Swiss-Prot record:
Disulfide linkage: C101-C197
Catalytic reactions of this protein: S-sulfanyl-L-cysteinyl-[protein] + uridine(34) in tRNA + AH2 + ATP = 2-thiouridine(34) in tRNA + L-cysteinyl-[protein] + A + AMP + diphosphate + H(+)
Top enzyme class: transferase
Name this polypeptide is given: tRNA-specific 2-thiouridylase MnmA
Site entry (Interaction with tRNA), positions: H126, Q337
Gene from which the chain derives: mnmA
Active site residues according to the UniProt entry: C101, C197
Region (Interaction with tRNA): 147-149
Species this protein is from: Rickettsia prowazekii (strain Madrid E)
GO biological process: tRNA wobble position uridine thiolation
Recorded GO MF terms: ATP binding; tRNA binding; tRNA-uridine 2-sulfurtransferase activity
Main function: Catalyzes the 2-thiolation of uridine at the wobble position (U34) of tRNA, leading to the formation of s(2)U34.
NCBIfam families noted in UniProt: PRK00143.1 (NF001138), trmU (TIGR00420)
Length: 358
């Protein structure tokens, strides 16, 4: 049997994975990352990697009789994820910290730690599938489409994918909870994490203001036709597609359609101004063969984790950039979010949406 490190967040998914692999006879080692201030985390519910979660992971490991280690990654998490999150908002973007965490902290460092422990693989509780294809491992969506997490894993490398294991890829959430209950785990009915783990009560502005007090610099709210409508209290308070809380009066509904951080301006317009035909993504990571120069490829893309995939055509630009052209216009494409590229259920790759949107 294999030696397998399980990334244990303290939730039902990773706990069920640890129990399942242990029952199969594998040598299981649990690792939990402490990612942010333990004082803030204590008693905080529905968040990943909180103080209660670390305790829950330890209790599951004790019940299973497996080794369990808690690694303090608070400083690295702040540098790689929280600071990036704050700067992204100041640049007029809508950040995606869970993907940055997977890329910069969880997978890279957990894999290194697992290898140092002599493990054959690292297992997680993500709802995705790894399928052995003709040219190596492929990342596919989870069978439970309501829980599929492939959107958040597009930054893993092909080499990392070979080492990873996703035992829940063929499970539904209901089946996972039943499995945890069968193993007698107290967390079988624990609610799923909802918040960004380092954002108390979902109020991200508190985090930004603490790190960048200058973030609330006021500026103009301007209609896309050029006339000024009012004043905003800081661009961090706005995101593309936002309608509520604009604080301006107009004869029809207005939406945030563009944020100009250089001039500290929030642009608003009618809903029709949100519809996008094409845009550019940068820092593209490929989990399949890279698209060739001058090639146009028909694919499906996801521009938000909560949206279904839509049909598009992609073509290669220079400097690891890809042009994405929708077959039908889509609404509210936000810089800073991810665009993940699919061929059916397979993840081909993905990148970060830039401000080059038309």
């Amino acid at each position: 049997m294999a030696t397998i490190v399980v990334a244990m967040s303290g939730g039902v998914d990773s706990s069920a994975v640890a129990a399942m692999l242990h029952e199969q006879g594998h040598n299981v080692i649990g690792i939990t990352l402490q990612l942010y201030d333990y004082g803030i985390a204590v008693g905080k519910k529905n968040a990943c990697c909180a103080g209660q979660d670390i305790y829950d992971a330890k209790m599951v490991a004790n019940k299973l009789g497996i080794p369990h280690y808690v690694l303090d990654y608070e400083n690295k998490f702040k540098e790689s994820v929280i600071d990036n999150f704050v700067d992204s908002y100041l640049h007029g973007e809508t950040p995606l910290p869970c993907v940055q965490c997977n890329k910069s902290v969880k997978f890279r460092d957990l894999i290194n730690t697992a290898k140092e422990l002599g493990a054959d693989k690292l297992a997680t509780g993500h709802y995705v599938r790894k399928i052995n294809g003709y040219n190596g491992a492929e990342l596919h969506t989870g069978l439970d489409t309501t829980k599929d997490q492939s959107y958040f894993l597009f930054t893993i490398t092909r080499e990392q994918l070979e080492y990873l294991s996703f035992p829940l890829g063929g499970f539904t959430k209901y089946e996972t909870r039943k499995l945890a209950s069968k193993f007698g785990l107290d967390i079988a009915d624990k609610p799923d994490s909802q918040d960004i783990c380092f954002v108390p009560d979902g109020n991200y502005k508190t985090v930004i203001n603490k790190i960048r007090p200058e973030a609330n610099t006021s500026g103009k709210i301007v209609h896309i036709n050029g006339f000024e409508l009012g004043e905003h209290s800081g661009i961090i308070n706005y995101t593309i597609g936002q309608r509520r809380g604009l604080g301006i009066a107009y004869n029809e509904p207005l939406y945030v359609v563009k944020i100009d951080p250089s001039n500290n301006i929030v642009y608003v317009g009618q809903e029709s101004a949100l519809h996008v035909h094409e845009f550019i993504i940068k820092d593209v990571n490929w989990l399949a063969d890279e698209i060739k120069d001058h090639e146009k490829l028909a694919v499906d893309v996801k521009i938000r984790s909560t949206r279904p995939p839509c049909h598009a055509e992609i073509s290669k630009l220079c400097n690891d950039r890809i042009k994405v052209k929708f077959l039908s216009k889509e609404k509210a494409v936000a810089p800073g979010q991810a665009c993940v590229i699919y061929a059916g259920e397979r993840v081909l790759g993905g990148g970060w949406i830039t401000s080059n949107i038309s």
